[in-house]
Amino acid sequence: MSSRPPSSSGPAGIPKGAPSQRQLRVAEEIRHVLAGVFARQEFRDPELATTTFTINEVRISPDLKHATVFISRLGSSEIEPLLPNLKRVATYLRGEVAKVMRLRYAPELHFQPDSALEYAMHVDSLLRRPEVKRDLDE
């Protein structure tokens, strides 16, 4: 029996819960494939065909069966109204991913609005306030 306390990192010092290299590679490839499909606007949904999207990040589960796609809409911050439309075309997008990638299972796609840019803009606006600038200059 080992006398060492349980550590918060896995083999080779990799933190538990951190994505593996394979997860990162597969997620980036999915992002690339989806970006191509969105750029070509190959949708039967008229609302999606006239909207420009940016896929900021894809996170994939350890078993590579579920992928969460973080997406934003260019020209507008409102992506929530289009999430049902994206859910409707998710099967088509999954098929497009399956055509390009060699995986045992094509991952099920889940779309989430990406709020990182909004958060960064909020922090920037806070830092530009006169009272904060005054405190930072001291």
From Swiss-Prot:
Region (Disordered): 1-21
Subcellular location: Cytoplasm
Keywords of this entry: Cytoplasm, Ribosome biogenesis
GO biological process, one term: maturation of SSU-rRNA
Keyword Protein transport found: no
Gene Ontology CC annotations of this record: cytosol
The keyword Cytoplasm belongs to this UniProt entry's keyword annotation: yes
Biased amino acid composition, Low complexity: 1-20
GO molecular function, one term: ribosomal small subunit binding
Major location category of this protein: cytoplasm
Protein family membership: Belongs to the RbfA family.
Its job: One of several proteins that assist in the late maturation steps of the functional core of the 30S ribosomal subunit. Associates with free 30S ribosomal subunits (but not with 30S subunits that are part of 70S ribosomes or polysomes). Required for efficient processing of 16S rRNA. May interact with the 5'-terminal helix region of 16S rRNA.
Assembly, per entry: Monomer. Binds 30S ribosomal subunits, but not 50S ribosomal subunits or 70S ribosomes.
NCBIfam families: PRK00521.2-5 (NF001802), rbfA (TIGR00082)
Protein name: Ribosome-binding factor A
Organism of derivation: Granulibacter bethesdensis (strain ATCC BAA-1260 / CGDNIH1)
Gene: rbfA
